[in-house]
């Protein structure tokens, strides 16, 4: 029996690791891209999570265009059930409302059909605005959080300091987009959005609660 040298042993181990990574499903194994999980689960019951999780969030607010529906992606870190969508309204406006929603993705991870869209929620007073839902998410799949403000209330927001771009920038001097939007809406789309625009700068910080 031939005894392998230490260098040969290392080469065998390296080949094994490379073959293992090739045969793993890229849609379900996100561990290599993530910090270490703290606790038993990524999504702990009753806590709030948003598109930047588990990366840092810079606390700030922003105002957004009336009639514009915003879409921001996140990748499910584990199987879970979303029971609530939520956002913090920081500046109220009389007669202002919002819709909250979550959308599936297609085979290219682009925004697709809705899994839940809420009825109008009043933003005539500031504070937490939420909608109950029952949406199953699956580890490794991409989902799109969404909001449609009618009127001009302000919210906590995500921006370049906390969200990853969804694709590259168009020039060396421009920002990369963080999500999508559609304009001139009175209600949330009930199908995959068409004529969507890239969104730069900031997006409303829609959050979700799981069980």
Language-model features, listed with the residues they occupy:
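Beta-sheet-rich sandwich/jelly-roll-like modules and their strand-loop junctions
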Residues: 29-107, 142, 148-211
